[in-house]
Design a protein with these regions (language model features):
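Short secondary-structure transition/capping segments
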Residues: 9, 107-110
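Conserved RecA-like helicase motor-core motifs
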Residues: 91-101
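Helicase P-loop NTPase motor core
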Residues: 2-93, 116-120, 152, 176, ...
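Phosphate/pyrophosphate-binding and catalytic-coupling "lid/hinge/switch" segments at subdomain interfaces
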Residues: 2, 101, 135-136
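Positions that flank functional sites
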Residues: 75, 101-102
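Proline- and acidic/polar-enriched loop/turn elements at helix boundaries
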Residues: 28, 72, 98-99, 162, ...
């Protein structure tokens, strides 16, 4: 509160007084009164993000402010996606404090790796990321052997997997069964890829891989946050499919292309000190 204006502190005091279960206290500030608080109503989170980004862009232009003069506060980790996407769409540089950017979080990168592998089975990096996630008993030694054999043939790991019954890499029956299970899982997604629109395909992959069940199994605050992030990713895909200017059905490949554009490194070229803080 010592860094806040009197207007903000007075508003906070008004909220605190409403909590009758808390011991009464009065916070204060020695700073100037500051500008009045503005309350904006939005129909949904996408509109909220657009309003906030537009307000930042407008104020920066009218009052000759720096991006670093702005901060966006939100309550839960999953809420960062909508603000990040809104800022990116307006080419406003930002940095996330206390957390990773939404699309850089482990659980999101895991899900996107499944999406990419489904769309492009030659993506070895995505395959290596998810072949044993959620845990299915395929260890590093097995993966190293597959990768070495693929390198020897100058081909991809997926090609080796789909022809595993034609080669002898010294795997026991249990390991072969696990590898076949993974291969069949991805093939099943590939068979439905062009028959399903982006959201339905994404939800199918997240459900059938067991990612949601894995995140639900451990109710620590960190895992609850990860689960909420994956749900928020699905919300983003839903918005992507519903906010089209034409009647074309969007596929998972279309969504991945959109993600690539949104996470383009162009914004990273801006001065790291001159960014909106979120």
């Amino acid at each position: 509160n010592y860094r806040s204006t009197q207007t903000i502190v007075k508003a906070a005091n008004s909220v605190i007084r409403m909590n009758r279960k808390q011991i009464a206290k009065e916070v204060y500030s020695n700073k100037e009164p500051g500008v009045p608080i503005r309350v904006v109503k939005a129909a949904e989170d996408r509109e909220e993000g657009f309003i906030v980004a537009g307000h930042i862009s407008d104020l920066r232009f009218r009052e000759q402010l720096a991006y670093s003069d702005f901060a966006v506060l939100y309550r839960t980790n999953a809420q960062s996606r909508i603000f990040e996407e809104s800022l990116r769409r307006m080419n406003i540089p930002y940095r996330v404090f206390g957390s990773l950017s939404f699309y850089q979080r482990k659980e999101i990168k895991d899900v996107l790796a499944y999406f990419r592998l489904t769309v492009n089975p030659k993506d070895d990096e995505s395959l290596k990321r998810v072949i044993n996630y959620p845990l299915r008993g395929i260890g590093k030694t097995t993966l190293d052997r597959l990768e070495a054999y693929a390198g020897k043939l100058n081909t991809g790991i997926w090609t080796v997997l789909v022809h595993l019954d034609q080669v002898n890499l010294g795997f026991n029956r249990g390991t072969l069964a696990k590898l076949k299970g993974f291969t069949d899982l991805i093939r099943g997604f590939q068979d439905r890829l062009l028959k399903m629109e982006a959201f339905d395909m994404a939800y199918t992959i997240i459900r059938e891989t067991g990612i949601l069940d894995d995140l639900k199994s451990d109710q620590t605050p960190e895992n609850v946050s990860r689960y909420e992030n994956v749900e928020e990713l699905l919300n983003g895909i839903k918005e992507f499919t519903e906010n089209l200017e034409d009647d074309r059905e969007m596929t998972l490949a279309d969504f991945l292309q959109e993600v690539t554009l949104m996470t383009d490194a162009d914004l990273e070229k801006d001065d790291d000190r001159n960014r909106v803080s979120i």
